Amino acid sequence: MTTSHILGFPRVGAKRELKFAQERYWRKELAEQDLLDLAKALREKNWKHQAAANADFVAVGDFTFYDHILDLQVATGAIPARFGFDSQNLTLDQYFQLARGNKDQFAIEMTKWFDTNYHYLVPEFQKSTAFKANPAHYVNQIREAKALGLNFKPVIVGPLTFLWLGKEKGEAFNRFDLLNQLVPVYVEILNALVAEGAEWIQIDEPALALDLPAEWVEAYKSVYAELSKVNAKLLLATYFGSVAEHAELLKALPVAGLHLDLVRAPEQLAAFEDYSKVLSAGVIEGRNIWRANLNKVLDVLEPLKAKLGERLWIAPSCSLLHTPFDLEVEVQLKEKNTALYSWLSFTLQKVEELNVLKQALNNGRASVQAALDASQAAADARATSKEIHRPEVAERLANLPKGADQRKSPFAERIVKQNAWLNLPLLPTTNIGSFPQTTEIRHARASFKKGELSLADYEAAMKKEIEYVVRRQEELDLDVLVHGEAERNDMVEYFGELLDGFAFTKFGWVQSYGSRCVKPPVIYGDVIRPEPMTVRWSQYAQSLTNRVMKGMLTGPVTILQWSFVRNDIPRSTVCKQIGVALSDEVLDLEAAGIKVIQIDEPAIREGLPLKRADWDAYLQWAGEAFRLSSMGVQDDTQIHTHMCYSEFNDILPAIAALDADVITIETSRSDMELLTAFADFKYPNDIGPGVYDIHSPRVPTATEVEHLLRKALNVIPKERLWVNPDCGLKTRGWTETIDQLKVMVDVTKKLRAELA
């Protein structure tokens, strides 16, 4: 019989119960025990959903209060020493302080989990790091699953991926040298799981899909030789890309099974068809929301079943934490666009799709004929739908003039024209875009959407907030202002709602980091901007002040990356469609007198393919799409872009090729680490490295901000340096926001006086 299993499940709950409970706990409105009880109830629901879908194992250990890599730092005793916490006796408050910072320490750095929109907390390894096992996180969840009578499979990220994802801190050394100390701690953790009755243990090694150095690849042999001594069957799970180049190594490892992502990299199956152990085929897309064509999947699985017999397992391609919880609650979408609804599949539907595949493999296709027919009908309808393809979009892309994505003049000429009218001081200060979104603002937006607030009352509320934001910025003496984005629920969703070719869910939330969830748009068809989207708000804000007002757009690559994207045409084509649509908005802003326009691209690096060999092609089309979004603007219009959550030292030439007049970047959490690259690569345009971390409510000291600014001045000419926070301030409160910005402006004025 074919075995089915799940690699991981969404953590936040069907209705984001965990998010709201966490935030109440942080505000001291919820007792710790109540938070723990809610989390336990969520885990039970998750496991019961998996069991109801006939999964042979439920995944345990994947649930987390913030991040599974943070949990692993605790489990291995690798929490940053600078906090002074004892990993063996860590309180829940201390756990959250690691993630969010406290009055004495900034939060652990956060970055993207491979090429997804999930963020993990980056382990800080030091030469003196002393690992110590604390398996309580996993053991406690196993005990809960056992108490429910469930067959379970613990899930833990493997030691090589864990080390690879971290960074060296302090005295120079190579974190790879810590491996021999780390492996015995893993053995101790795994033994604790075995003692609780674990027969199979899933060890995730997604780093194998990267371009790992030879010594790291070779280390898999010795590491798994040690781990395999544990009295359990190990399932080595890979995902997000092909591991075919490591096929001989993986087939020789002393593990009981191997999981392959056959959605992202179906071609790799050929390299493993002679695998002699359990082969887990990841055939249901774990990162997107499109319904599978189950007949096509079975065309792949049935020959595999004939070869492998009971050694064939089936699963989603990766953890389902990247997909929304349940399509069935999307009643409005079903009523509004029945066809699109029939093409979608969320977490609960995906585990049921897996169940259909399992029944078909075990009992024949006829046993699930109705489900297969429904799947086929949806696939056929989508392939021929006229809702998806709009000829005028393809025609416009095909007929773009040569050089459409290039500015009229080089930066050196543009900046002279821009400076002539901007007349800004040295080290100009600005905000990245959003200001705090109060309960009142969110309520007004929600009431308007529900039809409970008239358009006139809604616009009055937004204008009142915009004026408040403008006045606060004037009081702080910021140089280039923003309107604050009160009208925007999300930087991608807002634009998607105003562009044709996008659809929206009501409950399609996925975790971004900690309690932060996002509701990605669904790009299902060709993209067009039917009318202006932001012009009236920026125009109104500009009418309130004599200072420069910055227009705010989200760039094409970020809209693409932070959406669930159609999979029937290349992503590059979708991205260029969005870029061209945005260019209409940019020209309308320019015509309305908004001559500083920011086109945010925080997600440009996360779109990089995992293999470097594929980078150039991606960077070429991503850069073209970005430049297309401002095609046709005049030289004296200043185009800004913003990037966050990223490391771009290795793609600086591509970032420079975007040719934005000003780039602002997130750097404070990594102590301006990005700027070390500027010693070799002289970024040609203006740059604003973030001088404080907006992910924490902590107000930075003047000394800290000055330290970062002086580091920046060491590598960036003062004439080209801007001063700004790391990112937008949407998630912060007003009190801390004012205090944080005041420190930033005061320090800037001090340095201006020095440099004058």
Swiss-Prot record:
Its cofactor is Zn(2+). Zn(2+) binds at H642, C644, E666, C727. Pathway: Amino-acid biosynthesis; L-methionine biosynthesis via de novo pathway; L-methionine from L-homocysteine (MetE route): step 1/1. It catalyses: 5-methyltetrahydropteroyltri-L-glutamate + L-homocysteine = tetrahydropteroyltri-L-glutamate + L-methionine. Binds 1 zinc ion per subunit. Keywords: Amino-acid biosynthesis, Metal-binding, Methionine biosynthesis, Methyltransferase, Repeat, Transferase, Zinc. InterPro entries: Cbl-indep_Met_Synth_N (IPR013215), Cobalamin-indep_Met_synthase (IPR006276), Met_Synth_C/arc (IPR002629), UROD/MetE-like_sf (IPR038071). L-methionine binds at I432, G433, S434, E485, D600. The active site is at H695. Catalyzes the transfer of a methyl group from 5-methyltetrahydrofolate to homocysteine resulting in methionine formation. NCBIfam families: met_syn_B12ind, PRK05222.1. Belongs to the vitamin-B12 independent methionine synthase family. This is 5-methyltetrahydropteroyltriglutamate--homocysteine methyltransferase.
